[in-house]
Amino acid sequence: MTRPVRTRFAPSPTGFIHLGNIRSALYPWAFARKMKGTFVLRIEDTDVERSSQEAVDAILEGMQWLGLDFDEGPIYQMQRMDRYREVLAQMLEQGLAYPCYMSAEELDALRERQREAGLKPRYDGTWRPEPGKVLPEPPAGVKPVLRFRNPLTGTVVWDDAVKGRVEISNEELDDLVIARPDGTPIYNFCVVVDDMDMNITHVIRGDDHVNNTPRQINILRALGGEPPVYAHLPTVLNEQGEKMSKRHGAMSVMAYRDAGFLPEAVVNYLARLGWSHGDAEIFSREQFVEWFDLEHLGKSPAQYDHSKLSWLNAHYIKEADNARLAALAKPFLDALGIEDAAIATGPALDAVVGLMKDRATTVKEIAEGAAMFYRVPAPDADALAQHVTDAVRPALADLAAALKAADWTKEAVSAALKATLGTHKLKMPQLAMPVRLLVAGTTHTPSIDAVLVLFGRDVVVSRIEAALA
């Protein structure tokens, strides 16, 4: 009988979470949703010195922003210490683990001798009980570590959903330390107990964990558990071809929100960063879940491409509802010093956003473009001298008069502009540039007729006439 699918995301809260980390949440989330299974969030916080609540909060915030909802959790390893100690005691009782009194200095000396002899450094089993073997006398006052009795013969085999069949000889594996001298269990042991207790069926994680897998499988089997399906994802590289990391300049997940990216764009981009469905580049979260499978996970490292993410974000911005974008743009406008009163008395923000979004790759860019509608213009003096010349002033005066009488629609404003151009034998830039400067304070705007309509007749006419006075 096939077990119900249960996946997990098990981050360590020791720093911010970047795109490479969160991809290891996205894929198991999508697989659980596709298979109508359960997605578990587990916080692996046994590294007490480096773990922090701030990092946990960042994980939760990032997942919430991207819509990666979990069915169980967060489950904290530090809250499961009694369970780990229970299993350790059981393993000692059953002879699956044993105390080892070899000091760190002795272990270092052993490894050095092995290296000098051209051997792979490894624990030599000095304290491993065997039939007929006489163990050394435990040194007084020394607390031992606990080691797992790894099988001495045979091979650990698993069919990795990404790497294919993997075989590791047990002769390559020494007896892993599973508890420190103070009794606290180590990471590889806790993971096994958690995966077993939580009935995890599929472990989708980065391939930096692949070396842990044979050890975890051996411990799991010793405890009577059934190994899950493993899928070890190739590394995500940054744009320089290095492993994505904080040290190499990776941004945190929430930094993308703060830069004006939409969560659906980030999810779409992350989905393609190591998985594919034919040539499909743009797809919804629902489509991704429907299509997702383990068979099409990439086998080579995926390289982050910021321009590709920006392209996707621009697409989703164009598709987004103006009211939603306006709400998202508001904090960016606040940061630009645009006051609520200016927005309340100025053009409708929804409409401004609707005009600006086709030119933007981020919500931040929308806000930067929208700010001109809520500021008193302060055009550059050199630009004014260049564009608002004596030759163009009569045309500006006629345009102001025409706009006073025109219907206030884009079509009517466009007609007034064209009529003024014809009367004064000017080309559009000769008139549009000074109008942009006087009304908006900049020469960089969308279509001039659309911009003027949003500013409103009174503002447009008064600003042109004030410059001519």
From Swiss-Prot:
<dbReference type="GO" id="GO:0004818">
    <property type="term" value="F:glutamate-tRNA ligase activity"/>
</dbReference>
<dbReference type="Pfam" id="PF19269">
    <property type="entry name" value="Anticodon_2"/>
</dbReference>
<dbReference type="GO" id="GO:0008270">
    <property type="term" value="F:zinc ion binding"/>
</dbReference>
<feature type="short sequence motif" description="'HIGH' region">
    <location>
        <begin position="11"/>
        <end position="21"/>
    </location>
</feature>
<feature type="binding site">
    <location>
        <position position="246"/>
    </location>
    <ligand>
        <name>ATP</name>
    </ligand>
</feature>
<keyword id="KW-0436">Ligase</keyword>
<feature type="short sequence motif" description="'KMSKS' region">
    <location>
        <begin position="243"/>
        <end position="247"/>
    </location>
</feature>
<dbReference type="InterPro" id="IPR001412">
    <property type="entry name" value="aa-tRNA-synth_I_CS"/>
</dbReference>
<dbReference type="GO" id="GO:0005524">
    <property type="term" value="F:ATP binding"/>
</dbReference>
<keyword id="KW-0963">Cytoplasm</keyword>
<comment type="subunit">
    <text>Monomer.</text>
</comment>
<protein>
    <recommendedName>
        <fullName>Glutamate--tRNA ligase</fullName>
        <ecNumber>6.1.1.17</ecNumber>
    </recommendedName>
</protein>
<dbReference type="InterPro" id="IPR020752">
    <property type="entry name" value="Glu-tRNA-synth_I_codon-bd_sub1"/>
</dbReference>
<keyword id="KW-0648">Protein biosynthesis</keyword>
<dbReference type="InterPro" id="IPR004527">
    <property type="entry name" value="Glu-tRNA-ligase_bac/mito"/>
</dbReference>
<dbReference type="InterPro" id="IPR045462">
    <property type="entry name" value="aa-tRNA-synth_I_cd-bd"/>
</dbReference>
<keyword id="KW-0030">Aminoacyl-tRNA synthetase</keyword>
<keyword id="KW-0547">Nucleotide-binding</keyword>
<dbReference type="GO" id="GO:0005829">
    <property type="term" value="C:cytosol"/>
</dbReference>
<dbReference type="InterPro" id="IPR049940">
    <property type="entry name" value="GluQ/Sye"/>
</dbReference>
<dbReference type="InterPro" id="IPR020058">
    <property type="entry name" value="Glu/Gln-tRNA-synth_Ib_cat-dom"/>
</dbReference>
<dbReference type="InterPro" id="IPR014729">
    <property type="entry name" value="Rossmann-like_a/b/a_fold"/>
</dbReference>
<dbReference type="GO" id="GO:0000049">
    <property type="term" value="F:tRNA binding"/>
</dbReference>
<comment type="function">
    <text>Catalyzes the attachment of glutamate to tRNA(Glu) in a two-step reaction: glutamate is first activated by ATP to form Glu-AMP and then transferred to the acceptor end of tRNA(Glu).</text>
</comment>
<dbReference type="InterPro" id="IPR033910">
    <property type="entry name" value="GluRS_core"/>
</dbReference>
<dbReference type="GO" id="GO:0006424">
    <property type="term" value="P:glutamyl-tRNA aminoacylation"/>
</dbReference>
<dbReference type="Pfam" id="PF00749">
    <property type="entry name" value="tRNA-synt_1c"/>
</dbReference>
<comment type="similarity">
    <text>Belongs to the class-I aminoacyl-tRNA synthetase family. Glutamate--tRNA ligase type 1 subfamily.</text>
</comment>
<dbReference type="InterPro" id="IPR020751">
    <property type="entry name" value="aa-tRNA-synth_I_codon-bd_sub2"/>
</dbReference>
<keyword id="KW-0067">ATP-binding</keyword>
<dbReference type="InterPro" id="IPR000924">
    <property type="entry name" value="Glu/Gln-tRNA-synth"/>
</dbReference>
<dbReference type="InterPro" id="IPR008925">
    <property type="entry name" value="aa_tRNA-synth_I_cd-bd_sf"/>
</dbReference>
